[in-house]
Curated annotation (Swiss-Prot):
It comes from Sulfurovum sp. (strain NBC37-1). GO terms for molecular function: UDP-N-acetylglucosamine 1-carboxyvinyltransferase activity. GO terms for cellular component: cytoplasm. The keyword Aminoacyl-tRNA synthetase does not apply. It is found in: Cytoplasm. Pathway: Cell wall biogenesis; peptidoglycan biosynthesis. Coiled coil: none annotated. It comes from the Bacteria. The modification 2-(S-cysteinyl)pyruvic acid O-phosphothioketal is found at residue 116. Signal peptide: none annotated. This is UDP-N-acetylglucosamine 1-carboxyvinyltransferase.
Length: 422
């Protein structure tokens, strides 16, 4: 088992290039199922979840050539429509093959998903919407069995709550359906905008891209021919590196980043005293002598992202005063609190609110990652903790961060990946 050893107290400097967005790449990869021709994807991040989904495509019969940040995919040879437990249990996003498989082939079986253990993230909204489009769905032995013998048809889908994965699944299902699908209360993250633009560039008429209401005219079963897709920059990775600069009171520059996608994080960091130089595709954060406390509430895009909550908690732990952080999207996303407290943070929980009382210093300790973003918060805390911090169970990090320790080391951090002694 691998872990990260961090010796804290080093200032950071220099620049870091932001990788492609995992959460954009996953639905884009799933959407290639809508085509029976070659599709080229560029700027893919080197993370485990991407390799897992590409492996799933090959298990379905697709042909994948993947080298570095580029993948060439041809799903014209798919022979199976069953996404097996062995793959889906590793990564929740595997459920994204449900919509495209069903709309193209009229049937599929997908194992119920796995991934980060951050509360209940049921897929009932996905299934209810697909049923409205004509699917017959049963759940047996841990698998979703879906059939649409006459193909899917357009429908008016009103999501009871905003769901990113549900929106993505229905966009893909609607692309090859017969007739017009209207999605009300759709998610509008940049990753969803990229998926819509990819499908629209292939000839599908989509109105309302970037809004909460989408109208999609399907092709009635005709597969799509996609152009080359360049994955957008990872806004969560970008936010994480801004927090690395913030917590270490360092000046660093992020390259290949879209500032508009991380506006909520920038605004909160500005309220904490940090200043920024923002160019077309780069951002430089400038340090502050005193970190102000912050109050924030996680909410759907364009609000403050739940995927940045843990990282901001690490920064708030070093603030001059008390911060309040409310988690409204997931009920079990404070598992990093006890680990941050092991490093000397002073954090109290009451329901969905964390009260973070800033401390003068943190101290190195052994800590354990519990999910993807929580693990990055522990790394951030380790950057400023006195002594040595060992972050264990970093397979969570590898699911979503492209070479985190390498990029931090290039900025000046004392961080190395090590193997546990047997």
């Amino acid at each position: 088992m691998q872990y990260l050893e961090i010796k804290g107290g080093k200032k950071l400097s220099g620049s870091v290039t932001i990788s492609g967005a995992k959460n954009a790449a996953l639905p884009v990869i799933a959407a290639t199922i809508l085509s029976d021709k070659d599709v080229t994807l560029t700027n893919l991040p080197n993370v485990v979840d991407i390799r897992t989904l590409l492996k799933l495509l090959t298990m379905l019969g697709g042909v994948v050539e993947h080298e570095g940040t580029v993948a060439k995919i041809n799903n014209g040879s798919i022979t199976s429509t069953k996404a097996v437990y062995e793959i889906v249990s590793q990564m929740r996003a595997s459920i994204l093959v449900l919509g495209p498989l069903l709309t193209r082939f009229g049937e599929c079986e997908v194992s119920l998903p796995g991934g980060c253990a951050i509360g209940q993230r049921p897929i009932d909204l996905h299934l209810k919407a697909l049923e409205a489009m004509g699917a017959k769905i049963t759940i047996e032995s841990g698998y979703v069995h879906a059939v649409a013998p006459n193909g899917l048809h357009g429908a008016k889908i009103i999501f009871d709550k905003i769901t990113v994965g549900g929106t993505e699944n229905i966009i893909m299902a609607a692309a090859l359906a017969k007739g017009t699908t209207i999605i009300i209360n759709a998610a509008k993250e940049p990753e969803i905008v990229q998926l819509c633009e990819m499908i629209a560039d292939a000839g599908v008429k989509i109105e309302g891209i970037g809004t909460n209401e989408l109208t999609i005219e399907g092709t009635d079963g005709i597969p799509l021919a996609f152009k080359t897709v360049e994955i957008i920059p990872d806004r969560i990775e970008a936010g994480t590196y801004l927090c690395a600069g913030a917590i270490t009171k360092s000046e660093i520059t992020l390259n290949k980043v879209n500032a508009e996608h991380i506006r909520a994080s920038i605004d909160k960091l500005e309220s904490m005293g940090f200043t920024f130089d923002i160019a077309k595709d780069s951002i430089t954060i400038h340090p502050t002598d005193i970190i102000n406390p912050v109050n924030l509430i996680t909410i759907e895009y364009p609000g403050f992202p739940t995927d940045m909550q843990a990282q901001f908690m690490a920064v708030a732990a070093m603030a001059d005063g008390e911060s309040l952080i409310e988690e409204r999207l997931f009920e079990n996303r404070f598992m990093h609190v006890s680990e941050l407290n092991r490093l000397g943070a002073d954090i109290w929980l009451k329901g969905s609110v964390a009260a973070v009382k800033g401390v003068k210093e943190l101290h190195g300790a052994d800590v354990m990652a519990t999910d993807l973003r929580a693990s990055s918060a522990l790394v951030l805390a380790g950057l400023v903790a006195e002594g040595t911090t060992n972050v264990r169970r970093i397979y969570h990090l590898d699911r979503g961060y492209d070479n985190l320790e390498g990029k931090l080391a290039a900025l000046g951090a004392d961080i190395v990946r090590k193997e546990e002694e047997k």
